[in-house]
Amino acid sequence: MDIERTKLYYAGIKREDICGCNYCQNLIDEIKQAYPEVAAYLLSLGVNIERPFEVFFPMEDHDNGYMDYPVVQYLIAGNSSDFHETKIGDIQIGISDCHPNAAYEGEHFIIDAGVFHIKCRYDKYDFNE
């Protein structure tokens, strides 16, 4: 892994560069506060938890006001040989074998993290669009 190059990658990503759909924006609003330990772990790898590479469509629980995001993917610069799969609370984090192509110059790999149980911001987003 190349933590410094990973940090540079995330420093260049603005919120408006992320998917603008309500589901992704809801995740970005809530994930860091809901999962501070995961955010801290990802930050130790150079990853900004609020700048996902890819988000798998969530399942909404209307009765409880939460969504389950099964997989959130993040890019890490460098070689994956020194990355180790881990689990933080209920969140499993490992190397992805299924992801879109990244428009990133240089060696990199993608990690999967999930399942994230995230509050639905009905006050801010319409999830019926």
Feature-to-residue mapping (PLM):
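Generic structural motif
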Residues: 26, 79-83, 123-125
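Glycine-rich, aromatic-bearing surface loops/beta-hairpins
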Residues: 96-129
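N-terminal cysteine/histidine-rich coordination modules
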Residues: 1-44
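Primary mode marks residue(s) on the alpha4-beta5-alpha5 output face of response regulator receiver
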Residues: 47-50
